[in-house]
Amino acid sequence: MRLIIFGPPGAGKGTQAGLLEERHGITQISTGDILREAMAQETELGQKAKSYIDAGELVPDALVRDLAEQAIADEGHDDFMLDGYPRTDQQAEWLTEFLASNETPLDGVLSMKVPDDVLVRRLSRRRVHEETGETYHLDHDPPPEDVDPDLIVQRSDDEPETIQNRLDVYREETAPLATYYEERDLLVPVDGTGGIEEVFGRIEEALDALER
């Protein structure tokens, strides 16, 4: 299947996409992860992206598109789930045309629905290991007891005072994608509240419905 998963920060997109890859073989394509990996490996695209980031500039949309295109091609244009892309109607239109040119249209777009108060709690309870980058959650995935607590920190964008701004940006820039895909009969709303396995069960039900 060819899928997109999107929703506000804290909706659990990455967690659920990872489970789909682990249990159903649907490869998670996270443009953020791809970008970081490309820079770490110093690929041509990665070096270009790093030059913008080092200069304090946003990575151009065309460069992100190139990364997404290569990742999709690497998967043979099938059995993938995009996480973090597209973010705008313009990106969605490009993706539609790109997939159509390969006769591999999307099968569905999972839209994660979570109330703001739940999002704020999820995000404000996330922690990261300062040295390894390993992420944890104080409620359902706390750091092991043998980890130095002084190295467990909160990301600046997960601090309560910045979370609302992130949600506002999401609504302004990304939420309109729901309309774009709803008009194309691809949107599948998913209740993202509850435990990880509970939400995953709803996603599996949604995928079963798409396959029928």
Curated annotation (Swiss-Prot):
| Pathway where this protein functions | Purine metabolism; AMP biosynthesis via salvage pathway; AMP from ADP: step 1/1
- Spell out the HAMAP family in the cross-references: Adenylate_kinase_Adk
**Do you know which Pfam families this protein is assigned to?**
ADK
Q: Which family does it belong to?
A: Belongs to the adenylate kinase family.
Catalyzed reactions per annotation: AMP + ATP = 2 ADP
Cellular compartment(s):
Cytoplasm
Source organism lineage?
Bacteria, Pseudomonadati, Rhodothermota, Rhodothermia, Rhodothermales
Which Gene Ontology MF annotations are present? adenylate kinase activity; ATP binding
- Which PROSITE patterns does this chain map to? ADENYLATE_KINASE (PS00113)
Question: Where does the record place the region NMP?
Answer: 30-59
The protein's role, per its UniProt record: Catalyzes the reversible transfer of the terminal phosphate group between ATP and AMP. Plays an important role in cellular energy homeostasis and in adenine nucleotide metabolism.
Q: What class of enzyme is it?
A: transferase
Which InterPro entries would you find in this protein's record? Answer: Adenyl_kin_sub, Adenylat/UMP-CMP_kin, Adenylat_kinase_CS, ADK_active_lid_dom_sf, P-loop_NTPase
Residues reported to bind AMP: 31, 36, 57-59, 84-87, 91, 155, 166
Protein name as catalogued: Adenylate kinase
Q: Which UniProt keywords apply?
A: ATP-binding, Cytoplasm, Kinase, Nucleotide biosynthesis, Nucleotide-binding, Transferase
Can the keyword Ribosomal protein be found in this entry's annotation? no
Which one GO biological process term can you cite for this protein?
Answer: AMP salvage
| Region span, LID | 125-158
* Domain free text: Consists of three domains, a large central CORE domain and two small peripheral domains, NMPbind and LID, which undergo movements during catalysis. The LID domain closes over the site of phosphoryl transfer upon ATP binding. Assembling and dissambling the active center during each catalytic cycle provides an effective means to prevent ATP hydrolysis.
Q: Name one GO cellular component term.
A: cytoplasm
Organism of origin: Salinibacter ruber (strain DSM 13855 / M31)
Q: EC? A: 2.7.4.3
- Complex formation: Monomer.
- The answer to whether the entry has keyword Cytoplasm is yes
Residues binding ATP: 10-15, 126, 135-136, 194
Taxonomy, superkingdom? Bacteria
